[in-house]
Amino acid sequence: YVEGKFDKFLGSFIGPEGCCIFSHEFYETDRSLKHKRGYTIQVLRGAGPLETALSARKFKKLNFGNNFHDNFSDHYGRSIPLAIVCEDFPEEHNKIELDYDNKDSSGMPGVKIIYKLSENTKKMLSHGLSRGREIMKEAGAKSIITFGPVKHTGWHLMGTTKMGRS
């Protein structure tokens, strides 16, 4: 995940949820790189007021008190996030199992997802985060943060997992 913060108010919280623009520049395998397969870079909508405040507070960029509104205005509507979405390989250690210890209200077993990032995917993420930083720098972001993998996001694990015993 890469986020660029800009001096100018962009109104980046306006627009559709999810991916607004995406790039497939790095989607195919490039044999000159250290990883196989590729990833998309997705331009997302900026955060709304609550997420902006919580995120700025988390990174110690926002203080509650006398100058809160001015300080908040320095953050709100001024950021553009990019998501790096990798194409994993199916791997035996990733799997979906029935979870008999956690049942639903009808007594049916729940689902347990066992997933671990491969070294190849870690290399892809690293490459994507670097490209995202370059994009934000070229776009004129005054500050850039990168982090990942982001745990509670839209991971699509079915294609990388195995269900069953055979």
Regions inferred by a protein language model and the residue ranges of each:
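Mid-to-C-terminal "cap/lid" subdomains and adjacent gly/pro-rich loops that border
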Residues: Y1-R78
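A glycine-rich dinucleotide-binding beta-alpha-beta segment and adjacent secondary-structure elements
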Residues: G77-D88, H93, M108-S166
